[in-house]
Amino acid sequence: MKLFPLFADLQGRRVLVVGGGEIAARKVQLLLEASADVRVGAPALTPELALLAAQGRIHALQGEFRPDWLDDAWLVVAATDDRAVNAAVSQAAQARRIFSNVVDDAELSSFQVPSIVDRSPLVVAISSSGVAPVLARRLREKVESLFDHSLGALAALAARHRPRIRERRPDLKQRRKFYDWLLDGPVAALLRQQRPEEAERLLETALQAPQDDGAGSVVLVGAGPGDPGLLTLKALRALNEADVILYDRLVSPAVLALARRDADRVAVGKRPGEDHDATQARIHALLVEHARAGRRVVRLKGGDAFIFGRGGEELEYLRAHGVRYEVVPGITAALACAAYAGIPLTHRDHAQSVRLVTAHCREDEDTLDWAGLAREHQTLAFYMGVGQLETLSARLIAHGRSGATPFALIENGSRPEQRVVSGRLADLAAVARSHGVRAPALLIVGEVAGLARELHWFGAHLEGQRPAPAALAA
């Protein structure tokens, strides 16, 4: 270990920053956040630093660096663009046995400022010992994505109640269990939802109870269409906290690979030919069963759970059975697939509205407004439509939509195997058959679909042509 990590208490202690530019200003802001007594020395200051000096938040020393600026200083930061000045600061600090940092110059520094993830009172510092600062920044970005901004509030809440937690849970095992509940349960969820008063009340109520109720909870998570990079930070956190994951058939293996390794994974996806209502009833029962067993359950759905995902039905069931829940939205297939195909869903020249439509209706009724769907200057995004392509095109054309209207079929959208097949609405079913298009695939109908030919950037793009009659007969 080349450098020894330290966390310094700078509250009220003098720190000198030599330099008056933008880099110096960034260092000053960090030091002020740590409540340091900051002095800034330079021939001239940026407007930001000058304002801080005028407000009395820093003390300005105007002119060229002098060693006596170091009087009573605990630390010094050199942030000028002149290496000779920086070296003079470093030498003067070393002579006085004061730790010094020269920005972006490890050779002249006796301490380094790490990349920081601030969730005060929790702080994470990352250093590459000056060897690879870009790598340290990359790691910081990854760590930032793992820790919600509510984590600081949660740590502060736990610290405030620590004496009472110790009093009410004197047994070490019970106390650890309570902290697990506090950090992973509904109190943390309320803080993530920016509801601190309710979180405080819930913690107070829990402390009054003789023991934890052991109740679990359900998080309804939208997994997006497949690319794990499209997961939200909240979705990633939920996957890492889950005890059990009930996932749909269309959730990609790459997304599941990001989940907590020891979480139970239960496939509950519906398959063609199954009784979907019976399958949904089984999912409802599993959600309640696992939650009542005290588990943290993630219900993982492709796309967004509230866009043709029956998420509303599941929440109604959970509410009726007294199970706590929260919802993490996902990027729905229409948005992601269109973007990955280079298709803008709206365009000032072609489409002023977008309609998301399911082609998988109840078997006993067709409730779609075909006349409304056939209007021009709008984009239609059909979900679950691969088995209904002939009907979709025929009804749109019958209700007035031109057979020359462009379409795009996006198969396995956002995944490495993505294909986009485009053509004319009149040829939709025939083109899909000739290219062997299979689910999962999203159908986009409208003038904007024609832009995929020029704007596509990901995966394969195939320009569909209606097969010749002989080919169709074969």
UniProtKB/Swiss-Prot annotation:
Keywords on record: Cobalamin biosynthesis, Lyase, Methyltransferase, Multifunctional enzyme, NAD, Oxidoreductase, Phosphoprotein, Porphyrin biosynthesis, S-adenosyl-L-methionine, Transferase
GO molecular function: NAD binding; precorrin-2 dehydrogenase activity; sirohydrochlorin ferrochelatase activity; uroporphyrin-III C-methyltransferase activity
PTM annotation (Phosphoserine): residues: 128
Region of interest (Uroporphyrinogen-III C-methyltransferase), residue spans: 216-474
Entry annotated with the keyword S-adenosyl-L-methionine: yes
Record region (Precorrin-2 dehydrogenase /sirohydrochlorin ferrochelatase): 1-203
Official protein name in the record: Siroheme synthase
Organism of origin: Bordetella petrii (strain ATCC BAA-461 / DSM 12804 / CCUG 43448)
Lineage of source species: Bacteria, Pseudomonadati, Pseudomonadota, Betaproteobacteria, Burkholderiales
